[in-house]
Amino acid sequence: MRTTLTGTASVLDTTLTRLIDDVIENGSSFLADDENLQHYKQHLSHLETASKIALLRECLCVRPPLPLLPEDLLQNVDSILTRVRQHKILTPIFSLSPSRLIKHGDLGATRIHLWRGDITTLTGVTAITNAANSQGLGCFQPTHRCIDNIIHAEAGPRLREECFQRMQARGKELEPGEVLVTEGHALFASSVMHTVGPQLKRGASPTETERRQLAKCYESILEALELLPSDEDGSKSIALCCISTGLFAFPADEAAEIAVSTVTSWLQKHPSTTITDVIFNTFTQSDTEFYSKLLGPSHTKSISPVENTPQGSLSLAREWLSSADAVLVTAGAGLSAAEGLDYHSRDLFKRNFPGCLKFGLTSLYSVFGFNDWPSEEHRWGYFFTHLNMVANWSNTPTYQILIPWLRNFGQDAFVRTSNADGLFLANGWPKEQLSTPQGSYGYLQCLNNCRVDAVVPSAPLVADAMPHIDKATQKLMDPSKIPLCRFCGSKMSICVRAGSWFNQAPYQEGEAQWKAWKSRVLREKKNLVILELGVGMNTPGVLRWPNEDLVMRSDGRVKLIRVGMGPEAMVPWEQEDEGLSTCVQGDIGRAIPLLLE
């Protein structure tokens, strides 16, 4: 069932149609296939809101600054970006606790902070930094997950237009260490400091010249900030990203040392500075660890949700949850990632599976579909290590908040998850109120699926095998510990939906419990709220689309709250306009306390 487009939902489709025509007319080295673009244009009504936002950003990313976009189209984009950002969890600068103070005698002090998060969601900050390229126009490759892309996507096309005008006025490219200052446009920060750091070859050690160039970036940023007016409250602050450490390949640990020492030295040499706050902003866990060693750990003060987040979607979601008769939690990979069990994390894989790096594997996700194991001993060395790691995963603060809250609903709460990690059970949620349609690490199965009962519990086999796994190579050294089907003797694997061989038998009881629970709740006409956590687009037919369908077929008695990172967290705007769905965009680990406590 589809509803009529209203408000910003209609504006989004109209804007996308015009942008697609613009990209086709003006050409693009990246979105060069006109047929694909025409296909998108003809089928916009069938795309999810999340997909439309992603397509909008791609079109704007690849678009050259000339010809200038018409003002009415820019205003449409502004309204779309405004709606998107109303759903974000924000971090006010006043919620940060300083790691250190740089005192200036009787003139006060500059607070130094360390904060990990999305730099575009920091509020109350005068300026943020952008690790730019020498052209100063942003990144034109939408697949690059660089901060240049992120900042331009959030600021909107007016930022590229201003960058172009300022670069034209300069008449030359930016050199390493130079800074270009622009307005923030659709960003929360009033200004952006675009700087170009030194670019190294991957794996190379920086030269003394490159070290000086990186230091110059931070000096130039502080000098440019000094020239800006203070904010209304008298503060003047800058959020500093990790310059040159991504695609520019500057070693992250050395870059952190240069950043901290340069900023500290500059502030000490300028006791009359008007800069009140400097925030070292990190995005990865490894970068955070480097800065923590230099500055001390980061802290965020405990402040009320009203102060900490936008009023719109978060307040509405809290209201729905507080008045719900029943709650269905549907959880995807984003919930596990929020607890540190991130299947895309290179740091996690390198730390826990060093013996598997030589096979070209870089993350837990990269193992999906991997069949080039040298032997079964290597394959099961990995699987047993993986299962043991997950079974002993103890850092689950989100579950520690979520599950006690869910228990308040008694039999009117249910959990349905595509995660196989078993963390709901491990944190005390009853199996009678749990459905895992994609399988579970709790069982191993015959790869031939020779019989319905060709499954075995995994925990005893893991415990028996772990003493025989070489800690360096992570190879299973005792071949007798390799599990084989007790019926046909064939290979076995974890019992998850990874191929046509998947044995669903161990999970049929959970599916029956889910169907019975849903039928009862709907029959009793309870006000049901679906709290969807970290469900993306990898397998939308399992949780995401059924949730939306249930909302549309409920005559207003079922509402959906979608929580997650990035555009995938968006709900259909048509449903949102009807007051049936909303979303909270941000880290689930931060969202759950704000929603439930």
UniProtKB/Swiss-Prot annotation:
Alphabetical keyword list: Glycosidase, Glycosyltransferase, Hydrolase, Metal-binding, NAD, Nucleotidyltransferase, Transferase, Zinc
Binding annotation for Zn(2+) 1: 139, 144, 146
Macro domain residues: 99-299
Binding site for NAD(+): 333, 418-421, 438, 584
Residues binding Zn(2+) 2: 446, 450, 485, 488
Coiled-coil regions, chain positions: none
Binding-site positions, ADP-D-ribose: 118-119, 133, 146-148, 244-246, 248
Cofactor(s), by name: Zn(2+)
EC number: 3.2.1.-, 2.4.2.-
Glycosyltransferase among keywords: yes
Cofactor note text: Binds 2 Zn(2+) ions per subunit.
GO molecular function, one term: metal ion binding
Pfam families in the record: Macro (PF01661)
Domain of life, source organism: Eukaryota
Record flagged with keyword NAD: yes
Domain Deacetylase sirtuin-type: 307-597
Cross-referenced PROSITE patterns: MACRO, SIRTUIN
Catalytic activity: 5-O-(ADP-D-ribosyl)-L-glutamyl-[protein] + H2O = L-glutamyl-[protein] + ADP-D-ribose + H(+)
Family membership: In the N-terminal section; belongs to the MacroD-type family. Zn-Macro subfamily. In the C-terminal section; belongs to the sirtuin family. Class M subfamily.
Role, per record: Is probably a bifunctional enzyme with ADP-ribosyltransferase and ADP-ribosylhydrolase activities. In vitro, can act as an ADP-ribosylhydrolase that hydrolyzes ADP-ribosyl-glutamate bonds. It can remove the ADP-ribosyl modification from the human mono-ADP-ribosylated PARP1 E988Q mutant, which is primarily modified on glutamate site with only minor aspartate contribution. It cannot hydrolyze the ADP-ribosyl-arpartate bond in ribosylated S.pyogenes GcvH-L.
Quaternary state and interactors: Monomer.
Name of this chain's protein: Probable bifunctional ADP-ribose hydrolase/ADP-ribosyltransferase
The organism's taxonomic lineage, starting at the top: Eukaryota, Fungi, Dikarya, Ascomycota, Pezizomycotina
